[in-house]
């Protein structure tokens, strides 16, 4: 799921967060999150829901079926 990896990276960067900060918020290891971003591991369905909720996007947006929302002027 290469588009998922790209979207995770883009969403994290838009928010100015480190991988470690996202991993802590999701209660997973930083290595696991890194593997998601590098397309080395696919998140299970419950984690996909947590990721979408964390970033405030739909599953369709997260998975690339719909475009990601444009960043707001506040850097969102």
Label each residue range with its predicted role.
Residues 2, 13-14, 42:
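Short amphipathic helical patch at the helix-1/turn junction of helix-turn-helix
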Residues 28-42:
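Recognition helix of helix-turn-helix/homeodomain-like DNA-binding domains
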Residues 6-25, 50:
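Short basic helix-loop element that most often maps to the first helix and adjoining turn
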Residues 8, 22-23, 33-36, 62:
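Conserved hydrophobic/aromatic packing and binding residues within compact polymer-binding modules
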Residues 53, 63-76:
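Short, charged recognition helix plus adjacent turn
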Residues 46-61:
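DNA major-groove recognition helix of helix-turn-helix/homeodomain DNA-binding modules
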